[in-house]
């Protein structure tokens, strides 16, 4: 029953995010129109430059897993990287291409499941993702695939949070409710309630990461794959807007940063 439930999540996710594509695109456009654009661009450039200090962006091939309406793909293309962006939902890719405007022709947008990449081994220098792994039915498979697609010496950057932990933990539930109170008191719109919110909560109850403490889980898995992994649990302070800090105080964004060691040949990301 559990396996059947997880298998259905792929189609449910596609259906849900098809319905959310337009409104989620508006959220991304808002980020592109504010200081978030500069904050995130600086963050991405700094992380990648630290790993590849002597290489020009045009020589660095980047994969974004779960691009959604294209926020990261657009920023990375503006920074000069060679960008491929994949998403499970065709409607999201339509929004991403639209949002990219004249940059769309420089970004390779592909419909693809982040848990099963249609790329050869060791073909990307960097893999990036934001707010995706929590929503996956098999996040371990996604990490295995991302590690496989990374070149030796490559960099993985995954920005995520313990979204929906409040469904399983009383303390997290109380903190979540306090976020709602604080946001209302400050006159800030509640970003935690989107279209068809009940449907997403239903999915969140069934995906494996909602009741697992992260990023500890991520670091343990990546280390088991032979990657050198660490977490930055203060990244939210540098990239979130004041509105996001109020809305999501109880679920701060973290960054999982992992490096595939040069010459590594660890179980889990060998050729399929």
Mark where each language-model region is.
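A short glycine-rich, Lys/Arg-flanked "PGG" loop and its adjoining helix->strand segment in the class I
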Residues: 140-152
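A short acidic, Gly/Pro-enriched loop at the edge of an enzyme's catalytic core
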Residues: 115-126
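Class I SAM-dependent methyltransferase SAM/SAH-binding core
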Residues: 63-65, 69-116
């Amino acid at each position: 029953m559990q396996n059947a439930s997880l298998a259905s999540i792929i189609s449910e996710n596609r259906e849900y995010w098809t319905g959310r594509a337009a409104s989620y695109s508006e959220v991304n456009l808002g980020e592109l129109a504010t200081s978030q654009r500069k904050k995130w661009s600086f963050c991405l450039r700094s992380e990648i430059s630290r790993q590849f200090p002597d290489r020009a962006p045009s020589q660095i091939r980047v994969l974004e897993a779960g691009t959604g309406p294209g926020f990261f793909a657009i920023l990375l293309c503006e920074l000069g990287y060679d960008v491929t962006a994949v998403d499970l939902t065709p409607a999201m890719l339509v929004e991403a291409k639209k949002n990219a405007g004249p940059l769309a022709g420089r970004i390779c947008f592909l419909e693809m499941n982040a848990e099963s990449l249609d790329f050869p081994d060791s073909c990307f220098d960097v893999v990036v993702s934001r707010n995706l792994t929590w929503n996956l039915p098999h996040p371990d498979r996604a990490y295995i695939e991302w590690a496989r697609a990374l070149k030796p010496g490559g960099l993985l950057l995954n920005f995520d949070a313990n979204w929906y932990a409040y469904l399983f933990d009383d303390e997290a539930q109380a903190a979540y409710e306090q976020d709602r109170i604080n946001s209302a008191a400050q006159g800030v719109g509640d970003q935690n309630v989107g279209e068809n919110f009940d449907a997403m909560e239903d999915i969140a109850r069934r995906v494996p990461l909602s009741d697992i403490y992260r990023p500890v889980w991520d670091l343990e898995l990546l280390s088991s794959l032979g990657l050198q992994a660490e977490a930055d649990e203060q990244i939210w302070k540098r990239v979130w807007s004041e509105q996001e800090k109020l809305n999501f105080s109880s679920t701060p964004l973290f960054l999982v940063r992992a490096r595939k060691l040069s010459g590594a040949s660890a179980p889990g990301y060998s050729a399929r």
